């Protein structure tokens, strides 16, 4: 016997069905409107761009949301327990680094990084780039510009890649004037993600890989891997090269450099041929759980936002800790405080090893100098220098990566621990050399408790360095900008 619905039940079911259909209709309508708006943006662009366009302001009218959030990379209002977007003098906090970089420009100046909009400003103001008096003067090659501006691909196209690299940094001061922006990651005509720097493409080719076959999700990391990687300047032409031929690990790259007989500088105290790590962010991220699970850089550093019915990537690229509700909590259900402390716990533990390693390594350099002064021979010091080189490479590789102790905490702790082991082995080896020369006491240690004291110990004249840079910023840089404006390299305000 069939059970008939009561009248009110029928009306309720009918009304409920209508509500469901209405809500679904609204969802479909909203989706269609959103797609239509996105399509409208591309089909009715106010500014038609052909070829390479370095002036970020020209994308503002067609992509106002992305442009506005990109300008927020100029902010200096966030500090976590470790880094943020505020420039902090790292040498003042950890003066042992002055000793580790003795004989290299980083011993003069090293601060925590700021946002992309400060890229040109910060490299120009850094003591590391010196105070060149003319286009053929100065300590750095033009290769140093490579990751600082969308003007770089324009200059590479105009001059050729080899010719661009094989110049002085000051040669292009009036050409490279727009900070990291739109065309670095996007094809200016289609706005698709693209690779604008040749070094990444070349690294893939040497590994037998075709970067054009990367998936859209992979591209959300690969555009970052154009710059946030380990690299070196190869040969007299200072050709930017990624040492990935043997693999991504610290040992793989060390083997690559050793085989090539490469070093960045000879240490002023210990005479060690030192490898200076850059910032192997992409490589280390691939070794952590997020990278292994396919999470991209943009997923956490450029989370999606919705505004006016349009979903877009937040171009305020910054630490995910500044927006945990839109980054970590997209996948993890824990509270902001818990998630923040999860990150800090990993960083603190890695930094315990880092701090000890910096202390031991600084002593190893000083003790090696003492051994040379006592008459040690090159043959006697061979093993000492090899151990110092290995220890410092592991230290620098582990600390130069921004966020590495979160991206791959186990790998970073492994690397730093191996570095500490080699630093202590180096000190033991030095003591044996000294014993052969009749010295068995502790090596006297200088006072390097502050940046200023450490810089004085290694012979830097910081007053002269700062005075020269101040003059350079007041005279040369304004002239660069005036010429850039006259040549149309900067957008008119």
Swiss-Prot record:
PROSITE patterns: MULTIHEME_CYTC
GO BP field: anaerobic electron transport chain; nitrate assimilation
Catalytic activity: 6 Fe(III)-[cytochrome c] + NH4(+) + 2 H2O = 6 Fe(II)-[cytochrome c] + nitrite + 8 H(+)
Residues reported in the UniProt entry to bind Ca(2+): 230-231, 276, 278
Gene Ontology molecular function: calcium ion binding; heme binding; iron ion binding; nitrite reductase (cytochrome, ammonia-forming) activity
Keyword Oxidoreductase: yes
Signal peptide: 1-25
Enzyme Commission (EC) number: 1.7.2.2
Positions with a binding annotation for heme c 3: 116, 224, 227-228
Major localization listed first in the record, in broad terms: periplasm
GO cellular component: outer membrane-bounded periplasmic space
Protein localization: Periplasm
InterPro entries for the chain: Cyt_c552 (IPR003321), Cyt_c_NO2Rdtase_formate-dep (IPR017570), Multihaem_cyt_sf (IPR036280)
Binding site for heme: 144, 147-148
Binding annotation for substrate: 231, 279
Cofactor note: Binds 1 Ca(2+) ion per monomer.
Keywords: Calcium, Electron transport, Heme, Iron, Metal-binding, Oxidoreductase, Periplasm, Signal, Transport
Annotated metabolic or biological route of this protein: Nitrogen metabolism; nitrate reduction (assimilation)
Binding site for heme c 5: 290, 328, 331-332
Annotated binding of heme c 2, by residue: 182, 185-186, 315
Keyword Heme appears in the UniProt entry: yes
Something else known: This protein is not predicted to have a signal sequence by the program SignalP. All other members of this family are periplasmic proteins.
Family statement drawn from the similarity comment of this UniProt entry: Belongs to the cytochrome c-552 family.
Function: Catalyzes the reduction of nitrite to ammonia, consuming six electrons in the process.
Protein name: Cytochrome c-552
Gene name for this UniProt entry: nrfA
